[in-house]
Amino acid sequence: MSFSSKVKGEICRYVDMCKEDALAEISAIMKVSGTIAFSGSGLSFKMTTENPASARLIFTLLKEHFNIHSKLMVKKSNSLKKNNIYMVVISEDMGVRELLYETGILQDIDGIMNLNYRINKSMIETEENRRAYIRGAFIGGGSISNPERTYHLEFVTHSEEYAIDLKDIINTFGLNSKVIQRKSSHIIYIKEGEQIVDLLNIIGAHASLLELENIRIMKEMRNNVNRLVNCETANLSKTVNAAVRQVESIRLIQNKIGLQRLPQNLREVAELRLNYPDESLKELGQMLDPQVGKSGINHRLRKIEKIAEELRTGN
């Protein structure tokens, strides 16, 4: 089961709500996943989903809060996956016309019936109304990627005006959702893991939220370990390269003028480095009597490398 299906399965359990919240939720579902049809038998409305939990919720909300006994149909998808497609159909005799006006999908302008692509403010007056509306929009047209791979949550809509309205509702909770166009669709999306967690909390997907948080923590731990390993590997490589360079410089001095020509403090360090090429600067310093700190050893080796460079260039 995909992570999106888990989230929808969880939030579709919310059926015990007041009429105002039910109206906000069913309106959002209908706006993003429904189609209107006109035929000889009148007006009809169809909502389509691949998620059985979503279909059950739509059927239940219509029955319990609007006294509409809709028709639930199932057919096989034409896609390679051959998933079931669930359709909830409301016909003229079931009260579809009244429902379309009540949910704000239809409106009269100068006595003429028109489609309304905006979200009615009266439907989202309270915080709970807005939570229900966002939940409905996710049930009808939302998806979330597998958080093991990437963080991405989106709502697919078919109207720019509607997408902007929905984005504004989401952002009243302090989020930073954005709208982009993808072919003929308008997408509201969130890409930051922390903000996706907040949105799951808003719509009541608490179990999914905890699962995502656990994944985020594990990913962060793995990333921190990888960064630490990379840092240690880089430091080790740097140390090894420095030791090789120091040994090469000391051998050059040895071959050109002999180490006995070096001042005693430099000669001692040069001989130690030749005899212990794998030891750290700190360990080399501890071998001297009296002991010398890491910075002191580093300073002497830099002087040795400078002498070698002068011999190499003939200065």
From Swiss-Prot:
UniProt DNA-binding residue ranges: 280-313
UniProt xrefs under PROSITE patterns: INTEIN_ENDONUCLEASE
Record keywords: Cell cycle, Cell division, DNA-binding
Cysteine disulfide partners in this protein: none
SUPFAM superfamilies cross-referenced by the UniProt entry: Homing endonucleases (SSF55608)
Any Pfam family the entry gives: LAGLIDADG_WhiA
Molecular function GO terms recorded: DNA binding; endonuclease activity
InterPro entries documented for this protein: Homing_endonucl (IPR027434), Intein_endonuc_central (IPR004042), Sporu_reg_WhiA_N_dom (IPR018478), Sporulation_regulator_WhiA (IPR003802), Sporulation_regulator_WhiA_C (IPR023054), WhiA_LAGLIDADG_dom (IPR039518)
UniProt keyword annotation of Calcium present: no
GO BP, one annotated term: regulation of sporulation
HAMAP family to which the protein is assigned, alphabetical: HTH_type_WhiA
Stated role: Involved in cell division and chromosome segregation.
Family designation: Belongs to the WhiA family.
Name of this protein: Probable cell division protein WhiA
Organism: Clostridium botulinum (strain Eklund 17B / Type B)
